[in-house]
Regions:
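SAM-dependent transferase fold signal centered on methyltransferase-like domains
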Residues: 1-314
Length: 314
């Protein structure tokens, strides 16, 4: 079992993976980081770590076929001008160009990417992706990993297993959803005629994964509208990956309805979902202060009605 990390950097990822392998090679082009790694690895109880000062592309040419069990690579995600990239083609080193060589040296390659990257475009460009992992914590996507394999390459690699995971502060898994792009394309979730007792807002990992229809089927929920990524049900889902709210009232935009809303509260946390206005403009119109125990979702319902859902967190 041999791990090769082609972009060792500070060695954080390497130090977590290396104990799982009998051999572990850290590759880094910056001499200073290699010196730091050589000092730190014995202190981290990783005496088997081999430090190589080389460019990732250069070292890859020296790897014999099947000389590694797993290759890990974390390419730079900024362009020459310093702008963050959203396409895998813009990462350095060029993962698409290196993929055949990496898969020749190892049967499995794990690519760590920016959560800003376009997942579907990356899957199409590589054509050898078997798994996609999106990890969120504290309400924010933190990691995006692509697993590319020889087997996926032989099969076309364009319908990978996508797993969206929410990690809790204590390091445990707070929810996980696995599906394929084909599952999402074929899914036909029920659409609610009206909002029900509970409103469900999917977490960032699910949103990044694009599991908009699959989420409804997985948790036995109904969508509020085909293009509204909010869900509803009369039952409480304890392990829902996202935020859960109890619906207190539904208002439309008639004068009497808005007056009734303001008689209940003049302060709320406001969000828009599939709605033709920004939060700022809507807040001014509704004359609502920010914060408080109430949450209001401005959204579009199944019949096309624009509505305000007054909720409280569960």
């Amino acid at each position: 079992q041999h791990l090769v990390d082609l972009t060792g950097g500070l060695g954080v990822d390497f130090s977590f993976m290396a104990p799982l392998f009998a051999q572990a090679t850290y590759v880094e082009q910056q001499p200073q980081l290699c010196q730091l790694a050589a000092h730190n690895m014995p202190l981290l109880a990783l005496p088997h770590a081999r430090i190589v000062n080389a460019d990732a592309t250069q070292h890859l040419t020296q790897l014999a076929p099947d000389s590694a069990s797993l290759i890990f690579i974390d390419p730079a995600r900024r362009s020459a001008t310093g702008r963050k990239t959203v396409l895998i083609e813009d990462c350095q080193p060029d993962i698409i160009t290196l993929a055949p060589s990496m898969l020749k040296a190892a049967p499995v390659v794990v690519v760590k990417l920016s959560t800003m990257l376009d997942i579907a475009a990356a899957v199409r460009a590589l054509g050898c992706v078997s798994q996609v992992h999106i990890v969120a914590t504290a309400g924010e996507c933190k990691d995006l990993l692509l697993v590319i394999t020889r087997q996926a390459k032989a099969q076309g690699g364009t319908n990978p297993l996508i797993t969206a995971t929410n990690m809790l502060p204590d390091g445990t898994i707070g929810g996980s959803l696995t599906f394929t792009p084909q599952d999402e394309a074929n899914a036909t979730p029920p659409i609610a005629a009206q909002p029900l007792r509970y409103i469900y807002e999917p977490g960032p990992a699910i949103m990044k994964a694009g599991a908009f229809k699959t989420t409804a089927l997985h948790y036995q929920l109904q969508k509020l509208h085909t293009n509204t990524h909010l869900y509803t049900a009369d039952h409480l889902v304890p392990d829902f990956q996202g935020r859960t709210f109890e619906l207190k009232a539904t208002y439309t935009f008639g004068k009497a309805q808005l007056k009734a809303l303001r008689s209940v509260t003049t302060q709320a946390n406001l969000a828009v979902r599939n709605f033709p206005a920004s939060v700022d403009s809507l807040r001014k119109r509704l004359k609502l202060r920010d914060g408080g125990p109430y949450y209001i979702f401005a959204t579009t319902l199944a019949d096309g009605t624009h509505a305000l859902l007054l909720c409280e967190r569960v």
